[in-house]
Amino acid sequence: ASSVPSTAALLADACWPGPLTVLVPKADHVLPVVTGGRPTVGLRVPAHPLTLDLLERFGGGLAAPSANRFGKVSPTTADHVRADLGDLVDYVLDGGPCPVGVESTIVDCTVDPPQILRPGGIPDEQIAALLRNDVAPAAGPSRASGMLASHYAPTARVLLANSATEARQLASVNPGAEVLDRTDDLVESARHLYDDLRDADRRGVSVVVAVMPPALGLGHAIRDRLAKAAAAG
């Protein structure tokens, strides 16, 4: 980074290591290929012990794009990465299933007030509390991974329902549809979301009717991913 805004430092101190990415002005030596040609760079310190060990052994920062094909369902296990990328990568570090499941929260700290570009593993409410509610939702053109309207999409068509009753009704008029409802436990829902969608594809399910969780805590991230998966259909 060429500079670290005070909001980025505050969030990093509170949430790192953990699933938070802060967008800050990039340093001049950072290559455009790392930032997609943008003047900003996303920084994160993950909490997984295997990744922390890798960073310590390497002794510097790593440019680490997502290990999945563009627009498709994110991987949460080493097997998912192998299935998606095959021989395109030489090695896969296997640290077990991702404990959070959904990606990191991305906060753009180059604007005032900061904007949550992508809800994720750090709930929006926690970000707002740390910034004393001086935070805004994403606005303007795409500036980070996962901001496109259609993303995280399985082969199966995804339909959204606001309740279990509505989900059953939608499933009844869509032959071959299955209902996905983990709204009773948001932590488990986030952890298994992508694996559930991948499992539906593995079994040849043509339509997934997903019950939207409440818009609180990890529910923000789950709703975001399901809405983007549904937009692809």
Located regions from the model:
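Active-site-adjacent structural elements in enzyme catalytic cores
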Residues: 1-233
